[in-house]
Amino acid sequence: MVAPLKWLLSYTNLNINSKEEIHELAEEMTLSGTKVEEVVSKGAEINRVVVAKCLQVERHENSDHLFVCQLDIGAEEPIQIVTGAQNMRVGAYVPAALDNSTISEGRTIKAGKLRGVPSNGMMCSFEEIGLDCNNYENGNNDGIMILQDLGEFKDCTEEYFESIIGKDIIPVLGADETVIDFEVTSNRADCFSILGLSREAAITMHGKFTKPVVKVK
């Protein structure tokens, strides 16, 4: 049975976040009789992809379809990235894959030149960071992902966006979910549910389980 860690812990007072803590939970659950087959951390393969703010967009001097962008990534100086995305605009907050970063399918992004102009990374679409655009309000794969255009960020202030510059994009998008695959045997029918597994986790890790109250009108 597959259980998202956040959901599993939501009925307990357990605070389990780090890789070491998750490993300990999996190990202890297995020892207690609820075997863990696999722990999958979604988005873990995405590395050095951060939130960037576009400060400037200029046409590439040697191309009629490329743009040269200056991006604030929270460093001392802006970085320059060349893109062919037609939806790029000044003020956009976007995922920027930096030099020597890893995006979906294990692809590595390196700094280089496009038509003779230095480019220190790549701005990303949903697909390029391994996400399904259909899971986000107004999400699409037509060009670069722009955070302000997504329904999930419609109520966010400029101060909020400024505060996430340079942060890893996956946690910002809430896509850093850890999923645990349990092998539940027929004699443990009580664990064929999130509530059952949650109770088992609380007992195993010496925490408290709180059963949700269901109100019927």
PLM ranges: what are they?
Residues M1-K215:
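Phosphate-backbone binding interfaces of nucleic-acid-interacting proteins
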